[in-house]
Design a protein with these regions (language model features):
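N-terminal "arm"/small-domain region of PLP-dependent enzymes with the aminotransferase-like
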Residues: 1-37, 41
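Residues that form or flank phosphate/diphosphate-binding pockets in enzymes
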Residues: 23, 41, 99, 123, ...
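Phosphate-binding glycine-rich loop
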Residues: 40-89, 103-106, 113-115
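Conserved coil-to-alpha-helix start sites within the AMP-binding
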Residues: 95-101
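Active-site phosphate-binding strand-loop segment of PLP-dependent enzymes
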Residues: 119-199
C-alpha cells in the first residue's frame, strides 16, 4: 500500500503523533463517566496551573486558539477590558491564521495589515510604527512559529500612543522575550495545544 511505502522511506514525518498517553485517556474517561465534561474542577485546575506556569494573572480555557482569539476580540469592546468601539482600527500582521483577522472583523473593528519581517515572518516594527494613525486603538500581535517581535519596542510604541496590545501566542507556547513569557505582555493572549503548533 502507499502508506507502507511512505513508512519505508529513510525519513518519514507523520503529520501528527498521539499527544496523549494512558493517564490522559483515563482522565478523559473519568470525566465522561461522571458526566462532568465542561467547567468542572479539572478545568479550574488546568486554568490555575496554566496561569502559574506561564506567568499569567489568570487563564480561561476554551476549545481552541481560534475561539480564544474570538473571545478576546469581542472582549475588547467591553469598557473595563479594552474599551474599543466598533470601527476602531486594529493593526495586525499580514501573515497569520485567518481566524485571528476574522475575529477582529467579526467584533466590528477595522483591521489594517502590517508587513512582516521576511527573516522571522513576524510583524515588521518599522511598518507597524509607520501605520499607527489617529484611528488606531490596538495592536494584535502573532508570535509566529515560536518567534517573537522585539517586545520592548512594541510595548514602548503602544505606551506612546495609548494602544491596547493583544497577543496570539498559539504557536509560541513556552517562548520568552527577555525571560518574560510571550502572551503576558499585552492585555490578553491566546494559546493552543493543537498538534501542529510549536511547543
Amino acid at each position: 500500500s502507499s502508506r507502507k511505502n511512505l513508512q519505508d522511506r529513510e525519513f518519514f514525518y507523520p503529520l501528527a503523533l498521539a499527544t496523549y498517553g494512558v493517564d490522559e485517556v483515563i482522565g478523559a474517561l473519568d470525566s465522561m463517566i461522571s458526566f462532568r465534561t465542561t467547567m468542572w474542577s479539572k478545568t479550574s485546575q488546568f486554568e490555575d496551573n496554566f496561569a502559574a506556569n506561564f506567568g499569567a494573572a489568570e487563564a480561561v480555557m476554551v476549545n481552541s486558539g481560534s475561539s480564544a482569539d474570538l473571545l478576546i476580540a469581542f472582549s475588547l469592546r467591553e469598557k473595563e477590558f479594552g474599551g474599543l468601539e466598533i470601527g476602531d482600527e486594529v493593526l495586525a500582521p499580514a501573515v497569520t491564521w485567518p481566524t485571528q483577522i476574522w475575529s477582529l472583523v467579526m467584533a466590528g473593528f477595522s483591521v489594517r495589515l502590517v508587513d512582516v519581517d521576511p527573516a522571522t515572518m513576524n510583524i515588521s516594527f518599522e511598518d507597524l510604527e509607520a501605520k499607527v494613525g489617529p484611528r488606531t486603538r490596538a495592536i494584535s500581535l502573532v508570535h509566529l512559529m515560536g518567534n517573537t517581535p522585539d517586545m520592548d519596542r512594541v510595548m514602548e510604541l503602544a505606551r506612546k500612543h495609548s494602544l491596547v496590545v493583544i497577543e496570539d501566542a498559539c504557536e509560541a507556547l513556552g517562548t520568552k522575550w527577555r525571560d518574560q513569557p510571550v502572551g503576558t505582555f499585552g492585555l490578553a493572549a491566546s494559546s493552543s495545544f493543537f498538534f501542529s503548533h510549536h511547543i
